[in-house]
């Protein structure tokens, strides 16, 4: 189980310095946190000069603390007219402050500085501050040009699980004598695996143990004058005297032309369009229907919420990461003027038995889930909130709800602006890569419909076929929805899920569903499906009577989910199955990082019923992989959804030839 997050306690010394009672050490120099950040970390890493004329620049910090190093770096980036296009700041923190404590600490520090541009940034940071849950949290500022990737957890555990290429290291944290683990050889070896060949570092300490650990990990150091009269601090470069890593950190996809094809204009594809366009890519979106979001993404509404499991398994962690990331992306779209229809009053998940409710309640307590993510609801509380009878209690997801998938897809395409070209009513039959390295999307006649440096297949169950994948087992699952006329179902004020779901729509109409019918290809709504949905609704909300309505007279809709055999999505760079077959004998014990890849070919499919939760995170992962940016989730989670995972399993069992 993932360790729960224990927040930091905010304490000020008499001189105004923020201090940690847990570690018995100060968060910053009494001479000034922001001035220290500038002298030690910014100037110590040769910034801002080193990020100039770079498309993207990545900094890793080993302790976020009060956020002053990030705030000072952000302000320096803003003040530099020649700054890099995109600044990535990745920071690890075992004990993050709660939002309002962070606001107080940073505001207090800023109040004693003459660096005036920083003051407005404090509220921006605090307002974006995430729920204190383990894992990776990505925040964007300045229209996405500045990205803060927070990693909540023990650095010893999380640093080896990051995927990125670092250009500078801010080695901060409590003194080695107070928190020796953060300065251990294991930490520096993890950092060395993430370092760009030109990476630099800076730290306020000149401890002998730190110097030895740096040297062992391949970092060359030198002493320079410290901050505020301190005799010495350390700066240096990554300069290994030997080969220190089996796998190089990720690089950007190399191309002179930043154009891409996305096949499939549902939730998966439109999310990718928006993320690539935000990075300056010109995208051609190809959809076989006459309009976007016409298939499963064309449902009147979909629900969104994280999954919670007592053991905090991979699926639960992925859903939590996807849910929180989606909320951030949707808010950014709304701030940019690309509004779409979604509920904002929460979502209730009801248990199907008293025993299940007890397990749900215990899971919340055991995991330390913050109330802003989920809280337990007794049966009486659920009755009062939903204004109708329920059989059992459950969970309240305060930020969950329902959304119009088609409206979201339209907002994402609108955000792409003139970087998006659409081709509709055309079905792609296959892909081929030319001698010039560019991909061509061909129709059934062999005509080239579009060509680009990069292709993302996001067309659900057809993706594997178009990409020529033999080792990507997916299945179509029929899902029938039922629309209930006004007044025919309990008027719940917010979406309710459990065994099925009920969503209040406009004009008093209620949406309920959905059936789960593997390998059924009938696209016509059936009376039996409506009857099944009505019976499920009756179990969910006992005040409803399934026999009160004529199932044969109801309206509905059929969509088809695409589900992988392990129920996780397929997201990221695709494996080169032909190359793997040629090298099969050498790859029997391969890991995912050893598998040959289809250069410039990516996938975003197999989202099943969780497209709203997973699509935004999947799109961000693909965009980060293409542009060589820090990944927005742990490598362990990225590998769990790597499309090549099935190829690796086949190689291990000798099934690739």
Swiss-Prot record:
EC code: 2.1.1.61, 1.5.-.-
Biological processes, Gene Ontology terms: methylation; tRNA wobble base modification
Annotated stretches, region: FAD-dependent cmnm(5)s(2)U34 oxidoreductase: 263-657
Molecular function as annotated in GO: flavin adenine dinucleotide binding; oxidoreductase activity, acting on the CH-NH group of donors; tRNA (5-methylaminomethyl-2-thiouridylate)(34)-methyltransferase activity
Family matches, as Pfam families: DAO, Methyltransf_30
Function of the protein: Catalyzes the last two steps in the biosynthesis of 5-methylaminomethyl-2-thiouridine (mnm(5)s(2)U) at the wobble position (U34) in tRNA. Catalyzes the FAD-dependent demodification of cmnm(5)s(2)U34 to nm(5)s(2)U34, followed by the transfer of a methyl group from S-adenosyl-L-methionine to nm(5)s(2)U34, to form mnm(5)s(2)U34.
Region (tRNA (mnm(5)s(2)U34)-methyltransferase): 1-239
Keyword Ligase assigned: no
UniProt keyword annotation of Ligase present: no
SUPFAM superfamilies for this protein: FAD-linked reductases, C-terminal domain, FAD/NAD(P)-binding domain
Family from the record: In the N-terminal section; belongs to the methyltransferase superfamily. tRNA (mnm(5)s(2)U34)-methyltransferase family. In the C-terminal section; belongs to the DAO family.
GO cellular component labels: cytoplasm
CC cofactor: FAD
Subcellular location: Cytoplasm
UniProt keyword terms in alphabetical order: Cytoplasm, FAD, Flavoprotein, Methyltransferase, Multifunctional enzyme, Oxidoreductase, S-adenosyl-L-methionine, Transferase, tRNA processing
Name of this chain's protein: tRNA 5-methylaminomethyl-2-thiouridine biosynthesis bifunctional protein MnmC
Gene this protein is translated from: mnmC
Catalysed transformations (reactions): 5-aminomethyl-2-thiouridine(34) in tRNA + S-adenosyl-L-methionine = 5-methylaminomethyl-2-thiouridine(34) in tRNA + S-adenosyl-L-homocysteine + H(+)
